[in-house]
Amino acid sequence: MQIRRGCEADTERLVALAGQIFETEQEIPRALTPLPPENRPQWWCVEEDGALLGGVALYWEDNAWHMGRFVISPELRGRHVGTALLETALTDIFAQDIREVTMEARDTTVHILKKFGAETTGAPFSFYRGTVTPMRLTREAFWNSHTGGQI
């Protein structure tokens, strides 16, 4: 299994994976999954034997960097693959000239992100099937909680 930054050729498959899982599990319409080029999306993915089994995206929206489209195939859940994917993506994101990311996270993801120094910025709210919690994570908080402050 490999966790890596996605390339342009991966985008269609990652959008299809996220769309299928989000629609099936959360009733989110597939039409909401794609990210237009003007949002400058970057993807990270989990790949095994040529199959993409997880992904997360960073994109520019409402004058801020936003992380979302986080998805892990059901057969990989509970094995900390999602945590490793987020760790890889966040390490790469904060190695760029990005100071903060915002996100709306499901409960499981909230717990992972808090370990990386994220904080909630509002109360959970309904989003299709279930709720999401608004969060933000700064570069400084990530490095302090994840690497002891060493860059």
Describe the function of each predicted region.
Residues Q2-L14:
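A short beta-loop-alpha structural element at the N-terminal edge
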Residues G19-E48, L52-L53, A57:
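Active-site rim helix/loop that mediates acceptor-substrate recognition in acyltransferases
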Residues P41-C45, G55, R69, T102, ...:
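Short hydrophobic/aromatic beta-strand element in the GNAT-like acyltransferase core
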Residues A51-Y59, H66-V71:
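Conserved beta-strand in the GNAT
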Residues I72, G78-T91:
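Conserved acetyl-CoA-binding loop-helix of GNAT-fold acetyltransferases
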Residues I93-R106:
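Conserved GNAT acetyl-CoA-binding A-motif
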Residues T102-E104, E119-L137:
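Conserved catalytic-core motifs of GNAT/GCN5-like acyltransferases
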Residues L113-K114, A118:
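Conserved active-site tyrosine of GNAT-family acetyltransferases
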